[in-house]
């Protein structure tokens, strides 16, 4: 495993780990969910997430402390924010206690990938959920999937935080009273044009 031997070489990117958590919402209820080794998602070409961007996500990290413990910081707050995000996009909230348990299960199943203390690297944890059944015509999906994967990453700002060159434009990422206050995939897609344009200039 590269993190154990060369943590300084890991960037902020995706490296597959052993297991991820998956739960499904169908017929008005979430199932118990569980861990799987399969990193792939199979869905219909007309899935709600593909047609109408009905997806929300969170992000957090697990890291090794100086005394060798593996910890995360306040996953309960991420659980609450995902509930708020889901409600805003008319998605069934994933229960907060099950959210935290899914994080714990995923980290434990991939603890070999948590970088050692002092490397500056961490295990990035990505919980997300999305509408998975076919939807044509603008309306909420009826079936959903909640997933958590983890991947070892180096510092987001490699080499530390440095002064930035700013680019000011009249581009709006989110409209007033819209979805700017939640972690929805559509908000981040809206920022891509501004990011690419800024780097190009």
What residue spans do the PLM features occupy?
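Helix-start/capping segments and mature chain N-termini
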Residues: 4-109, 135-201
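Flexible, glycine/charged-enriched surface loops at secondary-structure junctions
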Residues: 95-97, 113-122
């Amino acid at each position: 495993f590269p993190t154990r031997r060369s943590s300084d070489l890991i960037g902020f990117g995706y490296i597959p780990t052993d297991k991820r958590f998956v739960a499904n919402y169908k017929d008005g209820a979430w199932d118990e969910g569980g861990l799987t080794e399969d990193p792939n998602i199979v869905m219909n070409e007309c899935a709600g997430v593909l047609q109408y961007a009905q997806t929300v996500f969170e992000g957090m990290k697990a890291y090794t402390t100086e005394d060798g413990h593996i910890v995360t910081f306040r996953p309960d707050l991420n659980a609450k924010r995902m509930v708020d995000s889901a409600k805003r996009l008319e998605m069934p909230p994933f229960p907060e206690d099950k959210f935290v348990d899914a994080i714990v299960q995923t980290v434990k199943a991939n603890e070999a990938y948590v970088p050692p203390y002092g490397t500056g690297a961490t295990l990035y944890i990505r919980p997300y959920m999305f509408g998975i059944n076919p939807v044509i015509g603008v309306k909420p999906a009826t079936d959903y999937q909640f997933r958590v994967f983890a991947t070892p990453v180096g510092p987001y700002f490699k080499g530390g935080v440095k002064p930035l060159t700013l680019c000011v434009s009249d581009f709006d990422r989110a409209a007033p009273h819209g979805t700017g206050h939640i972690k929805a995939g559509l908000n981040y897609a809206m920022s891509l044009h501004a990011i690419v344009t800024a780097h190009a200039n």
